[in-house]
Amino acid sequence: MEIEFQSYLLYVVVDMELYNGSLDTKEIFGRWLDEYQNSNYGAYIPFVGIIRAEDGITALSFDIYKPILQSWFDKWVEKAKERGAIVKMAHSIGDVPIHTSSYVSAVFSPQRKVALSLINEFVEDFKANAPIWKYDVIDGKRIYAQDRSTPMSGAGLLG
């Protein structure tokens, strides 16, 4: 059975984008590069998260409460600024089929060491602390992925 998913931009604030469905990584990364190509940044480090086929899932599905995610992201924008860098991200809302992308991020920096360090820190913190709720899609049913989710400190979720 083949499921067709459509993707369209739902929400954008400076340097953070939310889309319905899987991400068009080539379009996003190309647009980001075009935006900053002439800004004298010596490093552009992208990261792509791809949905793996495991445990019988056909897709993952995501819920996001935008104000909480925006607050989390704004802290990273400030951390990046302090190091002379820019951090960007895009994430999916809703269903994202296996072998497609639900998350991309990138760092632009004058120095590669800063960019490499910052992208690693950002992606690791995203995985551990970004307020995004993940569900497995198995046989067309959405099942909360509690075993692969991280409790949010002070939120009373998953705790």
What are these regions (language model features)?
Residues 2-9:
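Intrinsic disorder/low-complexity segments
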